Amino acid sequence: MHLVATHGHFDHNFGNDTIYKEFGLKPEIHRKDERLLQTIGDQAMTIVGANIDAEMPAADRLLSENDTIEFGSHKFVVIETPGHSPGGVFYYCKEENVAFSGDTLFKGSIGRTDFVGGSMFMLIQSLRMISQMPDEVKLLPGHGPETSIGEEVAHNPYIDR
């Protein structure tokens, strides 16, 4: 079992303490977002005024481009997609033609870049790279409905080829 994070923002990680207590799993996250894991409470207070008083586990594994994570017979490759956060990633399984896209790319939109460490320049570079993936790749974003590379290239105003 794995606890993987597409990036280090609080809304994707504030349950890490419970998962660690229940299952002994610590998050696996890109090395450039490790510091964000240490500021989950501060992020929640700044962004939504929520007080998260929990001891979050440190990262178990720091990921980089082309690292792999195996779930049974499925192998997911880490694809760096910085912009929404410095260490944003896709987890891509070529055999299943699916990618977990986190907050980099949504159906009809993209992730915000106004949080600490965000960069519109980096996000645009990531989107240019992502647009070269096969059209059939199903995307499972961190928020909202699923979509595909082809659907986003055809209809999302932020991504093209």
Regions inferred by a protein language model and the residue ranges of each:
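Active-site HxH/HxHxD metal-binding segment of metal-dependent hydrolases
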Residues: 1-68, 154-158
